[in-house]
UniProtKB/Swiss-Prot annotation:
Species of origin: Polaromonas sp. (strain JS666 / ATCC BAA-500)
Maturation and modification: Methylated by PrmB.
Molecular functions per Gene Ontology: rRNA binding; structural constituent of ribosome
Domain of life where this protein originates: Bacteria
Record's protein name: Large ribosomal subunit protein uL3
Function: One of the primary rRNA binding proteins, it binds directly near the 3'-end of the 23S rRNA, where it nucleates assembly of the 50S subunit.
Complex and partners: Part of the 50S ribosomal subunit. Forms a cluster with proteins L14 and L19.
SUPFAM superfamilies: Translation proteins
GO cellular component terms, A-Z: cytosolic large ribosomal subunit
């Protein structure tokens, strides 16, 4: 499923735990709360030039909502959310929902499905090139003095006489948007609207994430045989 026609869900990273299979194997999973994903606007080709669903998640105080946003949400009949995101979908998918509809997890995902999870990575603060870019340390001795954990030369001579843009150097590590691809949904708790996704997802506990169908998922053997 391509990125342009897949509905996703917004959620909050609850934390990690493990599940046990019937064979006794342990599976590490990340629990993502995707409850109360509500549609705030349905965009159509006729009115907006493309088909999309605008979805809100979380809760925000009324005093923290701007007047234009408050009017937009009041028109849809939904409460303000902490985050608002738009998903490009097909006309068929857009026609299934109306403004104010709560999208359940089972409507979008299924157990065994591969998904991409996007979030903000944990900030690590100012870091050197070894930690930030996985560079190697220099020699501990044999002529090396006070240059053990530095990157070394960052340029050339008088020509070009400058450091090229994009040179990997020290700086802020983390706190950037990261997408982890092709993660498997192990279980869906429909009662509590929780997704249990195998492996780790970006961000810290309590961080917001976006879950959508994997765009680089390889077809299964059964699907190949069907073709």
């Amino acid at each position: 499923m391509s990125l342009s026609n897949s509905l996703g869900l917004l959620g909050r990273k609850v934390g990690m735990m493990r599940l046990f299979t019937d064979d006794g194997d342990t599976v590490p999973v990340t629990v993502v709360d995707v409850s109360n994903n509500r549609v705030t606007q349905v965009k159509t080709e006729a009115n907006d030039g493309y088909d999309a669903l605008q979805v809100a998640f979380g809760a925000r105080k009324a005093s923290r909502v701007t007047k234009p946003a408050a009017g937009h949400l009041a028109k849809a009949g939904v409460e303000a959310g902490e985050i608002l995101k738009e998903f490009r979908v097909t006309a068929d998918v857009a026609g299934k929902y109306a403004a104010g509809t709560v999208v359940p997890a089972a409507d979008v995902f299924a157990v065994g499905q591969l998904v991409d999870v996007q979030g903000t990575s944990i900030g690590k603060g100012y870091a050197g090139t070894i930690k930030r870019h996985n560079m190697s340390s220099q020699r501990a001795s044999h002529g090396n003095s006070r240059s053990h954990n530095v990157p070394g030369s960052i340029g050339m001579a008088q020509d070009p006489g400058r450091v090229f843009p994009g040179k990997r150097m020290t700086g802020h590590l983390g706190d950037v948007t990261v997408t982890t691809q092709n993660l498997n949904i192990v279980r869906i708790d429909e009662a509590r609207q929780l997704l249990m996704i195998r492996g780790a997802v970006p961000g810290s506990k309590g961080g917001f994430v976006t879950v959508r169908a994997a765009i680089k998922a390889k077809p299964t053997t059964a699907a190949k045989g069907a073709n």
